[in-house]
UniProtKB/Swiss-Prot annotation:
Positions with a binding annotation for NADP(+): Y177
Enzyme Commission numbers on file: 1.1.1.2
Highest taxon of the lineage: Eukaryota
Name used for this protein in its record: Aldehyde reductase 2
Family affiliation: Belongs to the NAD(P)-dependent epimerase/dehydratase family. Dihydroflavonol-4-reductase subfamily.
Outcome recorded upon mutating G19A: Results in loss of substrate inhibition and of NADPH-dependent reductase activity
């Protein structure tokens, strides 16, 4: 573990992590605890964090505490739980994949603004990290060349499609999810520009995240949960709807959040979590290579390739500053996933 020089948040500082029971959030918590920070994690009920609380009590005694926020849209929802925090990682969001705009986009915006307002009213907060998504920049477009995505890229198309596509369209839920991430992040940057609070905002934009599932009881519906279902021979129709795209290790996503919270040179950045491209046949080929004695489903029909390119210079700077030479490979990420589920 690399020592963090001139960290914005001194070791031992308290960080509030919203939606801490989620798959990505649990990896953010893990990296914060591993690097000497204290974490207060929120969930809609204490039971949703019970297994993770036991894990972290055993590994990092006295450094993780559970806080219940039943409704992130309620006025003042975070006002109490944020007290004493030096940093905030706002990861809680709506992941129902409903195709109804008002059920997904509206609460995503409202929850984000609630957390920002609470931070603005809390003098101890120095950094605020928003978990966005690469879909706030673009939904993958297979076999299309010449797409380059940087910190100025926004998926404004998703907002229109989320409002206008018929509910019968099988892709509508994906566009609604993309709109929720796009609009919530845009609202966050607008809040910062208009209110000029005392803290710094950074955003982390993961793509398909693969890694250890810390709590199978609550995280089976995550991206890694879907991949594990394929490992176990279940071919969900939803998989065929997911285009080729980029993957990223959950470990690396945890580190990117950590870097956005503590590294002094990372300010007002949109940081992509995009290690390399994959499709389901890539995953199946990796399964067969790593576990040759196991039988897996047949390959999917040709899905094409994600030919887009991302500006990952800030991401790689963070990983290097935290002692990582670069991205974890898809093989490492899948080993992390399968090992956690078969141990």
């Amino acid at each position: 573990m690399a020592k963090i020089d001139n960290a914005v948040l001194p070791e031992g500082s308290l960080v509030l992590v919203t939606g801490a029971n989620g798959f990505v959030a649990s990896h953010v918590v893990e990296q914060l605890l591993e690097h000497g920070y204290k974490v207060r994690g929120t969930a809609r009920s204490a039971s949703k964090l019970a297994n993770l609380q036991k894990r972290w009590d055993a590994k990092y005694p006295g450094r993780f505490e559970t806080a219940v926020v039943e409704d992130m849209l309620k006025q003042g929802a975070y006002d109490e739980v944020i007290k004493g925090a030096a940093g905030v990682a706002h990861i809680a969001s709506v992941v129902s994949f409903s195709n109804k705009y008002d059920e997904v986009v509206t609460p995503a915006i409202g929850g984000t603004l609630n957390a920002l307002r609470a931070a603005a009213a809390t003098p101890s907060v120095k950094r605020f990290v928003l978990t966005s998504s690469t879909v706030s920049a673009l939904i993958p477009k297979p076999n299309v060349e010449g797409i380059y995505l940087d910190e100025k890229s926004w998926n404004l198309e998703s907002i229109d499609k989320a409002k206008t596509l018929p509910e019968s369209d099988p892709q509508k839920s994906l566009w609604v999810y993309a709109a929720s991430k796009t609009e919530a992040e845009l609202a966050a940057w607008k809040f910062m520009d208009e209110n000029k609070p005392h803290f710094t905002l950074n955003a982390v934009l993961p793509n398909y995240t693969i890694g250890t599932i810390f709590d199978p009881e609550t995280q089976s519906g995550s991206t890694s949960g879907w991949m594990m279902s394929l490992f176990n021979g279940e071919v969900s129709p939803a998989l065929a709807l997911m285009p080729p795209q980029y993957y990223v290790s959950a470990v690396d996503i945890g580190l990117l959040h950590l870097g956005c919270l503590v590294l002094p040179q990372i300010e007002r950045r949109r940081v992509y979590g995009t290690a390399g491209t994959f499709d389901w046949n890539t995953v199946l080929a990796t399964f067969r290579k790593l576990y040759p004695s196991k039988t897996f489903p047949a390959d999917f029909p040709d899905q094409g390739q994600d030919l887009s390119k991302f500006d990952t210079a800030p991401s790689l700077e963070i990983l290097k500053s935290l002692g990582r030479p670069g991205w974890r490979s898809i093989e490492e990420s899948i080993k992390d996933l399968v090992g956690s589920e078969t141990a």
